[in-house]
Amino acid sequence: MVDPQLCCTPLSAAPLDRARAKQLAGLLKAVADPTRLQLLSRVAAAGDGEACVCDLTAPLGLTQPTVSHHLKVLVDAGLLTRQRRGPWAYYSLVRERFEDIRSLLSL
């Protein structure tokens, strides 16, 4: 048997349990799409911290139903919040969720 101290780097953080791994996998699945990454980027870059779906369709060259579908995936993953105002929905980042991604990437 090989001595782990001679060949292996010790873990600097506790390994993920199954529940946390599933949670983070869902989060990564939500952002593992170029359109959704663009949407997150546009919402993050919005001057007042939120973006209307009506302002996100033309820059991406996508229809409103397609953009709304991708935004729903991001809302369901907890990365965005949605607020209805009349016929439009406005989206804002949930910055705390990005800490989850950041902590995962620093493993």
Residues covered by each model-derived region:
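N-terminal helix-turn-helix DNA-binding core of bacterial DNA-binding proteins
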Residues: 22, 26-63, 85, 89-97
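Histidine-centered divalent metal-coordination motifs
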Residues: 36, 69-70
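Alpha-helical residues within the helix-turn-helix
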Residues: 58, 69, 75-76
